[in-house]
């Protein structure tokens, strides 16, 4: 039995809400994936605030209709699609999808959309290879710490150098 008009409108409204909160969307070909595998993907995405939705392309088309940010997704809406909508940790969610695809070898990323720009598979792969937010913060903290250490050593070296020069001058004056 098909869905009623009211249930379709609810789905479109839910998709609009999710798109309004999302920073990035990925379109996956989910053909051949079992329910268990889809559940596994959804579980992996939860850690990075990602949601995986399987819906008809027509309903997604209605959800993005008139929305300038998401309208470019229209070109990817053909075939059997699952939509990964990500808010928050974009890199972590892309990594989760990529590791899932590597393990199952059944799903393929058709493309994605980030900040209104349509992304190719290569661009999505590049996002997945970026370090996580935590790693970047640790690298920045390490770099800042290294600079302060070098400044402290440099500041400490000025009086030490002066003291050595005075001692050397005093020693040369005694002989």
Curated annotation (Swiss-Prot):
An example molecular function term from Gene Ontology annotations: large ribosomal subunit rRNA binding
Pfam families: Ribosomal_L10
Function summary: Forms part of the ribosomal stalk, playing a central role in the interaction of the ribosome with GTP-bound translation factors.
Protein name listed in UniProt: Large ribosomal subunit protein uL10
Annotated disulfide bonds: none
Lineage: Bacteria, Bacillati, Cyanobacteriota, Cyanophyceae, Synechococcales
Organism superkingdom: Bacteria
One Gene Ontology cellular component: ribonucleoprotein complex
Species of origin: Synechococcus sp. (strain CC9311)
Family: Belongs to the universal ribosomal protein uL10 family.
InterPro entries: Ribosomal_uL10, Ribosomal_uL10-like_sf, Ribosomal_uL10_bac, Ribosomal_uL10_bac_type
Nucleus in keyword set: no
Gene name of this polypeptide: rplJ
